[in-house]
């Protein structure tokens, strides 16, 4: 009888161990965007780098495809602000180009019109959802007109990040 009890306990322990995810193989995921979506925008399989999350849940996700100076990159940074009315202006000052307001993305968002070369296209959106700010930067190697405006991909990414922050 004792032997059956031990066998039953051992079987239950093994079943529990086999059904739980392995700690060594667990991966942290970007809460704002998944790798498949980023890969679709960047044109292939991506590598994901994350900063450790803060107590408030702030996190930076960087998706990249390729290596070195020719890498395609998507950088998403999310920060919590103590005083959004004052602090958001500081984040907007990071905009290196002309600011164009964007409607229906979070509580407030702007496109930073950056200078594009004939081979590199860089787009940036800075937005706010309640007390959280997000900065989305997309770098791709394509021919882009300097006056092309915000690409549909970048707008969709900004909408998805803002939606995940609500």
Description of each model-found segment:
Residues 1-4:
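Positively charged n-region of N-terminal signal peptides that target proteins for export
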Residues 7-19:
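Bacterial N-terminal signal peptides
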Residues 10, 34, 84-87:
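Alpha-helical structural motif
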Residues 14, 25-28, 33, 64, ...:
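General secretory precursor processing signal
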Residues 21-62, 142, 147, 151-166:
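N-terminal "mature-domain start" segment
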Residues 41-120:
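Short, solvent-exposed recognition patches
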Residues 100-166:
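A short, solvent-exposed beta-edge/loop patch
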């Amino acid at each position: 009888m004792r032997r059956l009890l031990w066998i039953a306990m051992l079987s239950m322990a093994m079943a529990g161990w086999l059904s739980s995810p392995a700690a060594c193989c667990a991966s942290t995921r970007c809460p704002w965007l998944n790798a498949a979506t980023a890969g679709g925008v960047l044109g292939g399989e991506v590598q994901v780098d994350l900063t450790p999350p803060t107590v408030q849940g702030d996190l930076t996700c960087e998706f990249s495809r390729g290596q070195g100076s020719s890498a395609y990159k998507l950088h998403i940074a999310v920060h919590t602000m103590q005083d959004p009315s004052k602090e958001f202006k500081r984040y907007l000052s990071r905009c290196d180009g002309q600011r164009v307001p964007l409607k229906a993305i979070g509580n407030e968002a702007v496109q930073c019109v950056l200078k594009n070369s004939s081979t590199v296209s860089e787009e940036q959106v800075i937005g706010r959802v309640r007390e959280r700010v997000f900065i989305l930067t997309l770098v791709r190697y394509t021919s882009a007109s300097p006056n092309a405006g915000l690409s549909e991909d970048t707008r969709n990414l900004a909408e998805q990040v803002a939606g995940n922050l609500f």
